[in-house]
Structure formats: structure tokens, C-alpha cells
């Protein structure tokens, strides 16, 4: 899998923080997020899922993720936005790869990306969350085009 190393700016994000198996919580989170975006006429700059844990080290019921939209830096939450978080997604150096996801199988491209990145001795993972940006409406199109972001730092830092 090909990837690039990019410096990414901090993003302001709004949405829902979830805990539990990602294959259940992330789709449910996006249903909640879509309702909130539609009800409050939010104009998202991007749709993202943010992942905080390693599923090979953390039990499924404890996995943390956010389903969010990127919003302008001066965005404030509308009244009655119950359960919605507003926070910053840290910027920095990230490895970035594009993938096409079919049959709701988000795990396969992520695993391929991690495997490829671990082979690159120049970089190691940094202590920031991974995230994906959705480039199309997968529910409408039947597949998802995503950009995957893994935080990295130069080896030895």
C-alpha cells in the first residue's frame, strides 16, 4: 500500500464519543451524527471517524472512537446538542493512505496500511489518534473512498 508523510493541521471537530466494538458503535455513531447535522443544518467541512485504541491490545467493549464532522475554528455547538462533543483533533506528522472500502470491511485496508508502515524503519507511530476521512457517501454509492491517517514521528525521536 502506498502512502505519503504529511504535516496535518489541527482540526476542530464536533460529534459523538463512543465506547464499544467499532463494528457496532461507529455505524450507530454516524446515524446519530447524520441526524444532528441534518436537524441543526450543520455545514460539515469533512466527515471523520477517530480511533483512540489498538484493537489488538484493547478489549472490544472498551474501544474508543469518535464519529465527527470537521467544523470551522469558531464553531459553537447549537443549543440542545445533547451528547455532542466539540474538541480539537491534534495536528502533526501523519502517514496518509487512500483506500476503497467494500462490504463494510474497514479493517482490511487499515491492517494493510499498518503492516506496510511497520516495514518503514524511518518512522514509528506517535501518541495521537488515528483517523479516517470519508471522500464520498458510502451508503449511497455502495462503497467508501477514505483517506486513512496514522500519526508518526521520525524513528528515534
From Swiss-Prot:
InterPro entries: AraC_E-bd, DNA_gyrase_inhibitor, DNA_gyrase_inhibitor_GyrI, GyrI-like, Reg_factor_effector_dom_sf. The gene is sbmC. Inhibits the supercoiling activity of DNA gyrase. Acts by inhibiting DNA gyrase at an early step, prior to (or at the step of) binding of DNA by the gyrase. It protects cells against toxins that target DNA gyrase, by inhibiting activity of these toxins and reducing the formation of lethal double-strand breaks in the cell. Interacts with DNA gyrase. Keywords: Cytoplasm, Stress response. This is DNA gyrase inhibitor. SMART domains: AraC_E_bind. It is found in: Cytoplasm. GO terms for molecular function: DNA topoisomerase type II (double strand cut, ATP-hydrolyzing) inhibitor activity. Belongs to the DNA gyrase inhibitor family. One of its GO terms (cellular component) is cytoplasm. It comes from the Bacteria.
Amino acid at each position: 500500500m502506498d502512502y505519503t508523510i504529511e504535516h496535518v493541521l489541527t482540526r476542530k471537530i464536533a460529534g459523538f464519543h463512543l465506547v464499544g466494538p467499532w463494528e457496532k458503535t461507529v455505524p450507530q455513531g454516524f446515524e446519530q451524527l447524520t441526524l444532528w447535522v441534518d436537524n441543526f443544518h450543520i455545514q460539515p467541512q469533512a466527515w471523520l471517524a477517530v480511533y483512540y485504541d489498538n484493537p489488538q491490545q484493547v478489549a472490544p467493549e472498551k474501544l474508543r472512537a469518535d464519529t465527527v464532522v470537521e467544523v470551522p475554528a469558531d464553531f459553537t455547538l447549537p443549543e440542545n446538542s445533547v451528547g455532542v462533543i466539540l474538541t480539537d483533533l491534534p495536528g502533526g506528522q501523519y502517514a496518509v493512505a487512500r483506500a476503497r472500502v467494500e462490504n463494510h470491511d474497514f479493517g482490511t485496508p487499515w491492517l494493510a496500511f499498518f503492516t506496510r508502515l511497520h516495514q518503514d524503519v524511518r518512522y514509528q507511530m506517535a501518541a495521537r489518534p488515528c483517523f479516517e476521512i470519508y471522500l464520498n457517501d458510502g451508503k449511497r454509492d455502495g462503497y467508501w473512498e477514505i483517506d486513512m491517517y496514522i500519526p508518526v514521528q521520525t524513528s528515534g525521536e
